[in-house]
Amino acid sequence: MSLHKKKISLFAFFLLTVFTVTLKTYFSYYVDFSLGVKGLVQNLILLMNPYSLIALILSVFLFFKGKKAYWFIFIGGFLLSFLLYANVVYFRFFSDFLTFSTLNQAGNVESMGGAVGASFKWYDFVYFIDTIVYLFILIFKGSWLDKRVFSKKFVPVVMAASVALFFLNLAFAETDRPELLTRTFDHKYLVKYLGPYNFTVYDGVKTIQNNQQKALASEDDLTKVLNYTKQKNTTPNSEYFGAAKKKNIIKIHLESFQTFLINKKVNGKEVTPFLNKLSTGNEDFRYYPNFFHQTGQGKTSDAEFTMDNSLYGLPQGSAYSLKGDNTYQSLPAILDQKQGYTSDVMHGDYKTFWNRDQVYKHFGIDKFYDATYYDMSDDNIVNLGLKDKPFFKESAEYQSKMKGPFYSHLITLTNHYPFTLSEEDADIDKPNTGDSTVDGYIQTAHYLDQALEEYVTDLKKKGLYDDSVIMIYGDHYGISENHNNAMEKLLGEKITPAKFMDLNRTGFWLKIPGKEGTVDKTYAGQMDVMPTILHLVGIDSKNFLMFGTDMLSKDHNDVIPFRNGDFITKDYKYVNGKAYSNKTNELLETQPKDLDKNKKQVEKDLEMSDNVLNGDLFRFYKNPDFKKIDPSKYEYKTGPKGNQK
């Protein structure tokens, strides 16, 4: 055997570097990153996802000649290892992954520097041991390297194989988590399904797109939006303006709740007996049966976003994920600056989901009680996170220790797709539609109703009920059009496109201290909540940019736009380019007189709101009634229960 055959060929060095960097990445998945990996498919994806980009990047250096090619591969491998370790350190400190936007924030970079020493682990040498070995070979054992030119005709084959592997990885990821790239739920999800290197590329592309849109925006764009939204200003209802000044505000988010459940019975038993009682008008709550969600692909995050900012979500993706670093004039920040409210969010999932740990800083939210503040033992968890009953119980305890006035937002989880519940927690029989999603939905909605009743009882016991504004709302539909056949069996009627729009009613219940309950049939949407609450506490909404109008005002605009351009009014609905009667859901033979005007208004609303987000226009807004939020002043620490994944 000749001497050169015993040497390390360039291709062998390439393969070895790809293998060791991938091995370190795989090590980080199970030792340092809490990715919540479950099942064979997710483990297979995890095994697959680092290879493609590592191989694609390093294969470029196979075009070079001699020792220089070895050095380039080494440097490429080192930079990938450095990126991996930087993410490891950042994750240990922030439970999240590095993005270009976080690197642009000085506070994060400074924290990163301090975090290295504080979070160093004894096994961290694993991330660089191969680097040390390769460096030793390149400097001291150059004779081990085969200097012959590598055949370049194989390089495109290697690159093509890397690209093919990426698309195979993406296909598996989309199968296990549909709409992964469009909805961008959580950085952890993206890393779990794509790997840290592909995530960095994805984040870079999104950052460039956002920066380009921002660069083209100007103060003139903001002026156009302000001139448009000023036309929406409503005169406050004198009976309600200031009626809840400096009262605590409790906002309760009912996951995937739709109002077809109200007064619905299954096998003779009410699905939501407590909410049924609140919907009569005989209790303390003002019930809006014609309240619609206005979410897009961001679903839950869109509902939060719209209700706290009176802006629409994006046409694609989630504003939380894609526009989380924008400047905002949010409801909690206005309440703080004008009336001294503190604000918090309570949620039985971890803070990085939907990028909440970053977005909330830009909303000026003071505290985030995420899963690390709750008992996340196995008995308390179902589906995506903490069950609603223990969630509400622990949340009420936290709230009882708060000083008012506070704005507290509780986000439930149990009534979430795929609507699974243990036999122990299920207190109503499933219907027999033949569709496990629809059948399960009845059980989880019933459980949610029970949990809500227990929570309201706790508020009364702790003295928080009487003097608080309480909002209860459904965030978005739970049952999609894919389940129309089962829904027809459950409801006993045909689900037409017009009927499906009716099913987008998610309900809104509003308790105002000192005011009697009623059933208010006003047509309204999530966009209208922010101006309504501002007027209730005595803050005029005309001083702020909003697309919604006060539901209690006589000037309220009852044209309710949806993110896809459809809309509904008190008389008719516009679905897929056709107008239907609200009373009969039949196609209208004569076009409503105000149809064209309303279509233009809806299109303009969506366009203007998109301009605000894409151009980050609030950064230009010099509002004398509002001081810009400084996100660096907010930090959401890990709770006393810690990360229990």
Swiss-Prot record:
For this UniProt entry, which residues form the secretion signal?
none
Q: Which GO terms describe its molecular function?
A: metal ion binding; transferase activity
EC id: 2.7.8.-
Marked site, Cleavage, at 217-218
- Give the keywords, sorted: Cell membrane, Cell wall biogenesis/degradation, Manganese, Membrane, Metal-binding, Secreted, Transferase, Transmembrane, Transmembrane helix
Please give the pathway this protein is involved in.
Answer: Cell wall biogenesis; lipoteichoic acid biosynthesis
Per UniProt, the enzyme's principal EC class comes to transferase
Which sequence ranges are listed under topological domain Extracellular? 29-43, 92-124, 175-645
Subcellular location, principal: membrane
General function of this protein: Catalyzes the polymerization of lipoteichoic acid (LTA) polyglycerol phosphate, a reaction that presumably uses phosphatidylglycerol (PG) as substrate. Is required for staphylococcal growth and cell division process.
| PANTHER family recorded | LIPOTEICHOIC ACID SYNTHASE (PTHR47371), PHOSPHOGLYCEROL TRANSFERASE I (PTHR47371:SF3)
Q: Which family does it belong to?
A: Belongs to the LTA synthase family.
The name this protein carries in UniProt is Lipoteichoic acid synthase
UniProt organism field? Staphylococcus haemolyticus (strain JCSC1435)
Q: What is the lineage of its organism?
A: Bacteria, Bacillati, Bacillota, Bacilli, Bacillales
